[in-house]
């Protein structure tokens, strides 16, 4: 399944790359390894453009090794990791340190966002576009407290950023006022069902609208992350190449009634909102106003998530089951599988100018996932690879399973287990990306 069509084809991989695609290929040598994918789906490996793998500084929650194991188990072959670690990734030295950690430990291909702050606009301006996934701006306060709220700084970053800008869009003053009102009503025992009231649709729309306005004014490339409301979709068009939007799988799957059973486990920023928002976002995925499907994988320990509303951190582990979630939505008729491949594989590669990944093409790196449509997956906590060792999908049965994952031509996941060792490579980007 690739570039809008399905075909029964053999794929020859040599030295990590796809050498040939043909309806019938004879083994080039007696020692050639043959992987029989009869009756199964071969997809490009997913490129997840938003994950939090917590290293360095937050490794009590997760690390690049464990979360990359979960990634390849879920068919994710490349990830772009966010800068809100400790210390935050606010300069190229910190970013290169993270690359060095990933080079030793990651099973998946890796790239890292350079974080923006109120103080580092010149660092952002001088960044090498070939070495970073993009520039991340927290236009709303979230985990890690990297808020950029000075208008002059925002304008400068949008004017000079050498890459696409990825934004977390929530209006912090609105959220703080909603928190004050919630405390007045509930005291410290705020129910988790109030989360979408506190981190409200108005907060999202106000911030996303500002980001789009800045991008148009400064002719910047903007990618708005984790859109959660129907109203925000009106900011985007299917044919706009410079202003794009992402939706995350949990916002496509859960809705506000889910807080009753899952509570803190699905507390995330921005919040999961109404069923009508979920349906609107699914429609946006179909019609192209949503360009990218991703996870915002953000693990915390089980103990941390047991806190009260103001103490339990926002975020949940998703990367191991994101493809299965997308395929479940295909099964339910939300959108076709071709759309999943476009939004989760092809579009991230195009939007972020990724070199030679994201497609099943001759000459490209062999990042491939084999999916078995006849073998179901029951989410069992004994079979989770994220370090936090819990999932909001525990006990869920998915209709597909990930059979095998290749990363740069090497088997990274097979037989229900990630491989030992390191298979990931640093993702390469084009040098002109403004």
Regions from the language model: what does each represent?
Residues 1-29:
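N-terminal metal-binding scaffold of metallo-dependent hydrolase/deaminase domains
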Residues 16, 39, 50, 71, ...:
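Divalent metal-coordination and catalytic microenvironments
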Residues 25-42:
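Active-site metal-binding motif and surrounding structural segment of the metallo-beta-lactamase
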Residues 40-105:
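Metal-associated gating/positioning segment near the N- to mid-region
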Residues 100-116:
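A glycine-rich helix N-cap at a beta->alpha junction
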Residues 122-293:
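Histidine/acidic residue-rich metal-binding segments in metalloenzymes
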Residues 189-210, 214-219, 265, 286-293, ...:
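His/Asp/Glu-enriched, well-ordered alpha-helical/loop segment
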Residues 308, 362-428:
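C-terminal cap of metal-dependent C-N hydrolases
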């Amino acid at each position: 399944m690739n570039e809008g069509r399905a075909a029964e084809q053999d794929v020859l991989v040599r030295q990590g790359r796809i050498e040939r695609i043909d309806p019938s290929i004879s083994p080039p040598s007696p020692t050639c390894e043959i992987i029989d994918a009869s009756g199964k789906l071969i997809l490009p490996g997913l490129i997840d453009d938003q994950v939090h793998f917590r290293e360095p500084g937050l490794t009590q929650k997760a690390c690049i090794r464990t979360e990359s194991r979960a990634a390849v188990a879920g068919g994710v072959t490349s990830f772009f990791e966010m800068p809100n670690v400790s210390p935050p990734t606010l300069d190229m030295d910190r970013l290169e340190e993270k690359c060095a950690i990933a080079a030793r430990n990651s099973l998946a291909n890796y790239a890292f966002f350079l974080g923006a702050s109120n103080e580092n606009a010149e660092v952002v301006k001088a960044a090498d576009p070939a070495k970073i996934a993009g520039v991340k701006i927290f236009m709303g306060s979230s985990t890690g407290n990297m808020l950029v709220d000075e208008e002059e700084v925002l304008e400068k970053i949008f004017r000079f950023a050498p890459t696409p800008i990825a934004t977390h869009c929530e209006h912090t003053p609105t959220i703080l006022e909603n928190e004050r009102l919630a405390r007045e009503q509930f005291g410290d025992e705020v129910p988790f069902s109030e989360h979408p009231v506190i981190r409200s649709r108005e907060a999202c729309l106000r911030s996303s609208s500002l980001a789009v306005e800045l991008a148009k004014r400064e002719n910047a490339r903007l990618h708005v992350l984790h859109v959660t409301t129907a109203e925000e979709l009106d900011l985007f068009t299917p044919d706009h190449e410079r202003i794009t939007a992402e939706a995350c799988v949990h916002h496509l799957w859960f809705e506000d009634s889910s807080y009753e059973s899952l509570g803190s486990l699905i507390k995330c920023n921005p919040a999961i909102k109404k069923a009508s928002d979920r349906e609107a976002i699914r429609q946006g995925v179909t019609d192209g106003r949503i360009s990218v499907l991703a996870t915002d994988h953000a693990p915390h320990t089980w103990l941390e998530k047991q806190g009260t509303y103001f103490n339990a951190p926002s975020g949940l582990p998703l990367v191991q089951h994101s493809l299965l979630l997308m395929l479940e939505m295909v099964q339910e008729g939300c959108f076709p599988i071709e759309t999943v491949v476009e939004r989760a594989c092809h579009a991230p590669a195009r939007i972020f100018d990724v070199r030679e990944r994201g497609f099943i093409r001759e000459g490209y790196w062999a990042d491939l996932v084999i999916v078995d449509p006849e073998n179901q997956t029951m989410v069992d906590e004994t079979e989770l690879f994220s370090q936090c060792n819990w999932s909001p999908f525990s006990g869920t049965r998915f209709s597909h399973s990930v059979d095998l994952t290749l990363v740069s031509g090497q088997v990274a996941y097979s037989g229900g287990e990630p491989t030992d060792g390191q298979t990931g490579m640093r993702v390469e980007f084009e040098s002109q990306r403004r």
